[in-house]
Every structure is written in structure tokens, then in C-alpha cells.
Design a protein with these regions (language model features):
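Hydrophobic faces of well-ordered beta-strands that scaffold small-molecule active sites
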Residues: 132-134, 188-190, 234-236, 321, ...
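Aromatic/acidic polysaccharide-binding cleft in carbohydrate-active enzymes
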Residues: 139, 363-369, 410-417, 422-432, ...
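Conserved, mostly hydrophobic/aromatic
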Residues: 27, 136, 180, 190, ...
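Active-site-proximal helices and loops of the catalytic beta/alpha 8
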Residues: 224-232, 242, 247-257, 314, ...
Length: 580
């Protein structure tokens, strides 16, 4: 047993309160090095009467490690614990201090979860577990009110450029809510709606005003009301890392320089502010001089931005915020942001844009979730780009899942493309079967899937600005078969809770193989998913305990033979079977 590989620490994702009564414990061991792990757990004040061994199950694995987990409901909301590691006859007891070959004589040097204090429990919005998001880039979704088109707006459907406009607005979304209801989505994520000079609106001019080319606050209220009547939640985009060049405090700074009362609203390295060899003398988003970075440690800046965060919840009843460039803003600002937002709307969804491992933001005091780009990369590598085999993919998924507490995984924002990337169908070189297979994993995985507008009807597009084409509303030019496919995926996900929050176990993910088999299981259902990520048909066989199954799409009855299911799949095929 390689003890050097064994890892655990209290709190974070290793020992945390899942709710007000339940504690999850996790421990890491070298892959395939330990055959069984148990938690020895009890109350520190009545250890002899309360201690018991709780078996742990293998939660996930990656290329180096196995991750084990168990759930404990302590009678008095506190826990003293250690671990028993077994590899056949070999046994070690792990304490906070050491590895022992005999059980510890007393609990003094074990790990401890002191008490489940309600204020410390990481609570995420329940509704997000059941959400299917649809991302809308407002300027390109639909033009519902030509009277508010920006000057120089082009006819709908032209070639997107970084600086052109087509007149998309909020009335256009209202006009096409039926499309969203028909598709089956129950949440919308809008890129920024506030006053700005660009078509993407990430250069905010006024955080308290809807951009006139999109409508006004009354239009937004109407849209949110219509969405809520249909069971659709609404998420807005906040750009609190930086403003735009026309933001009034920055305009004043440009005019008055070091004498501006707003000079401390930004990070100025040198006056007068200028751009020298392509580098501004003030901090910005990237090196973009038109997007000066805001000083969120400044009391006035903080007050203004938190007021904006509250305003749109109070006035328009929005359901949460997506936070742009979230990892470049200080943690203390986000802690205050969470307190303000959750006080107004406890089930508001706080989603950070972070493209990397995000544990520091997912400890219950800042975000509910992040945009799950490690998931995105793993899915695209395997299903789209053919990088790595099934084992590599399962390792990447296991590693990512093990990083966060379960409640954060359950509301993770799982996307495969967006306004920042090439479109999924384009990434698949137009191969719809590959696109569908990737989407089927997305919709049968823990977390909230998101469809980028137009993907459901076969829209294509390379990197920005090509991925921001005008939505195609001519039904003759829409891929209706693909639309039906997404409808069915959404229907199945919402029908079976196991596909949303059930435990995931890989039954087959072998080195050198393109085949993938995994189960999603909860108290209601057990579903096994077979995937063939190859360009030719494959027979896939996997051992199962149950005899009777049904195809959840067709309803066809399937029987296991000699303790195994044998499924023939076409190229890039997928079958989902449920125990009956």
C-alpha cells in the first residue's frame, strides 16, 4: 500500500456538510492500490458508545488516484473520524497524525468536524439541479422592435463582424418564447443587457440601465414575467471586473486625470493615462484600453456595484447572476456580493466565469457554481477532437468531479460552446452524429446543461465573431430533426432524476477503446448508458446484476444474458437502458 499517495484534510471538498445534518467524507488513495476503505467515526464526547465503521465507496478515479466517499448523519451534528485502509490482509488506520497498524487507542488524534453550524453549510439553489439553460446573445437572437435599432443596423442574417449590429432586442426574445417552451428549456442565460457601446455589451456604460437598443426596464420586466409564467428562470450577466470607456467615472478620469475624484475607482499605474506600446498605463481586462479594471476594494465602487446587483433582483425579479472574469475580482467583494444577493433572493443562482479549477470560490461563501470548462474540455477532447481514449476521458471526468463538494457539482454550468468559442457543430466538422453523442453525455451528467442559441437547429460558426450569427428563424432553413433530438434529450433528463443527480459509475472505459458505458443511479432508477465514440459500428458487452431492462427512448424490452448486456451500436451511437 503506497501510503505516500493517501490524502485527506478536514473541510474543503474532503470533509464538508452537505446539508444541515449530513457530512460527506472523502479520501484519496493510489489508483487500484487499496481494496476497501472505511471511516471510523463517532462523537468525540461519547466515543466508546458511538464509534462505528462506515464503508466508503469509490466516488471517482483519475490516472493516478482513487477517490472514496461516504455519507454520515451524526446524531449530534459533530464528528470525530479516521480511516481504515485495506488491501487484502494489509491494514492501516489513518489518524490526523499518522498511519497505524493497530486501531488508535483513543480518538484524541483523529480528524474532526467540530459542528454543523447552519451558517457554514454551503447551500445551492435546488431549482438549478433541474435546470436546462439556453444561452442568448441578445443582439443576434431576434429583432422584435426595429424602432430602437442602433444607427447603421444591418438587415437580419448578414455576416457578423466584431463591430456591426443587426438589431436584436428583448422584444425579439418575447416574440420567440414559444420556441424556448417548445424546445423544453427552463432557464435562460443572457449575455449583458446593460448600456454599452459594443454589440456584446461587455464594456458597461451604465449598470443601472438596459441598453436602449434592447429596450428598457419595462421590457425586461415583461420578459421575466412571461418566462416565470412558463417556468423559465432568467440569469443576467454582470461585468464587475471592468467597465467600459464610456462609464461616467472613467470619462471623468480621462478628462481630469490625477484630479478626478474617481481616480481610485480604477488601478492607475501612471498619469496621464495613456497606451504605451500597446500596454495601457492603467489595469484593464487583458490589455484592452476600452475596458478599465474596477477597484472593487474601493468603498464607492463596491457600493455602486452591489446596488446594481440588488436593483435588478428587486425591480425585475431576475433569478441570478453570471459573473464575467470572476477570478480576477477579489474574494472579499464576492463574499459581500453573495450576502447581498442571497438576502434578497435566497435561491438566486450565482455563477462565476472561471475557466480553471475553482475550489477557492466554491466553499459556500462566494459562488454557487462556475462555468465548468474542465468538463467542456474533457468532452470536446474525447467526443469531438478524438484526443485520448475512454480511459483518459473517464479520468478527466473523475478528477473534475472529485474537486468540488457534491452540492457544487449538482449545479455546475455544463456547456459545450458559447459566444466565446466556435459552435459545437462546427467543431464537429458538420458531423451531427458526433455532435449528438457529445450532447448526450452533457445531458446525462451531473450539473445543468446549457444549449447555445441556434445549436438546436443546426447553426454553425467558427470563433468570435462567426459564432455570433443572427438566429435563423426561417423554419425551412432550420434542422428540425436536430431540434427534435434536443427536445427528446431535455424530456428524458427532466423525466429521470437519476440523469440529473444520481451517482455516476463507469462500467467500461478502457485504455485504447472508444466505447464508454456508465450508470446513473438514484433511489428511483438505475440507467446504464452505452456510447460508441467510433466511426464504425461496435458491439459492447458489460456485466450487470439485473436481468430486465428497457430502452428509455423506444420502450423496447431488453434482457441480459448470462449476467451481461450485449449492445450493438452504430457509429457514434448511444443507447440508454433502465432497470425494470
Amino acid at each position: 500500500m503506497l501510503l505516500e499517495a493517501v490524502y485527506h484534510r478536514p473541510k474543503l471538498n474532503w470533509c464538508y456538510a452537505y446539508d444541515g445534518h449530513t457530512i460527506h467524507l472523502r479520501i484519496r488513495t493510489k489508483r487500484d492500490d487499496v481494496t476497501a476503505v472505511s471511516a471510523m467515526a463517532g462523537d468525540k464526547y461519547i466515543w466508546d458508545q458511538s464509534m462505528s465503521y462506515v464503508p466508503m465507496h469509490k466516488l471517482a478515479a483519475d490516472e493516478l488516484f482513487d477517490y472514496w466517499e461516504c455519507e454520515i448523519v451524526p446524531e449530534y451534528r459533530r464528528l470525530k473520524y479516521g480511516f481504515l485502509l485495506e488491501n487484502g490482509p494489509e491494514k492501516y488506520w489513518m489518524t490526523e497524525y499518522d498511519f497505524l497498524k493497530q486501531p488508535p487507542e483513543n480518538p484524541d488524534r483523529l480528524f474532526e468536524y467540530p459542528f454543523i453550524n447552519p451558517a457554514d453549510v454551503f447551500k445551492t439553489p435546488e431549482w438549478v439541479k433541474d435546470a436546462v439553460f439556453y444561452q442568448i446573445f441578445p443582439e443576434r437572437f431576434a429583432n422584435g422592435d426595429p424602432s430602437i435599432d442602433p444607427t447603421g443596423a444591418l438587415p437580419w442574417g448578414g455576416t457578423p463582424e466584431r463591430d456591426n449590429f443587426f438589431g436584436g432586442d428583448l422584444q425579439g426574445v418575447i416574440d420567440h418564447v414559444d420556441h424556448l417552451s417548445k424546445l423544453g428549456v427552463n432557464a435562460i442565460y443572457f449575455t449583458p443587457l446593460f448600456t454599452a457601446t459594443t454589440n456584446h455589451k461587455y464594456d458597461t456604460e451604465d449598470y443601472m440601465q438596459i441598453d436602449p437598443q434592447f429596450g428598457n426596464i419595462e421590457t425586461l420586466k415583461k420578459l421575466v414575467g412571461i418566462c416565470h409564467e412558463r417556468g423559465i428562470r432568467v440569469l443576467l450577466d454582470a461585468v464587475f471586473n471592468h467597465s467600459g470607456r464610456t462609464f461616467a467615472p472613467f470619462v471623468d478620469l480621462q478628462k481630469n486625470g490625477e484630479n478626478s475624484r474617481y481616480k481610485d475607482w480604477f488601478y492607475i499605474r501612471e498619469f496621464p493615462i495613456a497606451v504605451q506600446d500597446g500596454i495601457p498605463t492603467y489595469d484593464t481586462f487583458a490589455f484592452e484600453p476600452l475596458m478599465p479594471k474596477l477597484n472593487t476594494d474601493n468603498a464607492e465602487v463596491k457600493e455602486y456595484l452591489l446596488k446594481a446587483a440588488a436593483y435588478w433582483i428587486e425591480e425585475a425579479d431576475i433569478d441570478g447572476w453570471r459573473l464575467d472574469v470572476a477570478n480576477e475580482v477579489d474574494h472579499e467583494f464576492w463574499r459581500e456580493f453573495r450576502r447581498v444577493v442571497k438576502k434578497l433572493k435566497p435561491d438566486a443562482y450565482i455563477l462565476g466565469e472561471i475557466w480553471h479549477e475553482s475550489s477557492p470560490w466554491l466553499m459556500g461563501d462566494q459562488f454557487d457554481a462556475v462555468m465548468n470548462y474542465p468538463f467542456t474540455n474533457a468532452v470536446l477532447d474525447f467526443f469531438v477532437d478524438g484526443i485520448g481514449d475512454a480511459r483518459n476521458f473517464a479520468n478527466a471526468i473523475g478528477k473534475q468531479f472529485s474537486r468540488y463538494p457534491r452540492q457544487a457539482n449538482e449545479v455546475a454550468f455544463n456547456l459545450l460552446d458559447s459566444h466565446d468559442t466556435a459552435r459545437l457543430l462546427t467543431k464537429c466538422d458538420g458531423n451531427k452524429d458526433k455532435m449528438k453523442l457529445a450532447a448526450q453525455f452533457q445531458f446525462t451528467y451531473t450539473g445543468a446543461p446549457c444549449i447555445y442559441y441556434g445549436d438546436e437547429i443546426g447553426m454553425t460558426g467558427g470563433h468570435d465573431p462567426d459564432c455570433r450569427k443572427c438566429m435563423e428563424w426561417d423554419e425551412a432553413k432550420q434542422d428540425q430533426e436536430l431540434f427534435s433530438f434536443y427536445q427528446e434529450l431535455i424530456r428524458l433528463r427532466l423525466k429521470y432524476s437519476a440523469l440529473r443527480t444520481g451517482n455516476l459509475t463507469f462500467l467500461s472505459a478502457e485504455e485504447g477503446s472508444a466505447n464508454l458505458v456508465y450508470t446513473r443511479e438514484d433511489a428511483k432508477d438505475k440507467i446504464v448508458v452505452f456510447m460508441n465514440n467510433a466511426a464504425k459500428p461496435q458491439n459492447i458487452e458489460v456485466a450487470v446484476e439485473e436481468d430486465s431492462w428497457e430502452d428509455i427512448r423506444s420502450g423496447e424490452a431488453i434482457s441480459a444474458r448470462l449476467g451481461a448486456l450485449n449492445i450493438k451500436l452504430p457509429a457514434y451511437g448511444c443507447v440508454m437502458l433502465r432497470v425494470v
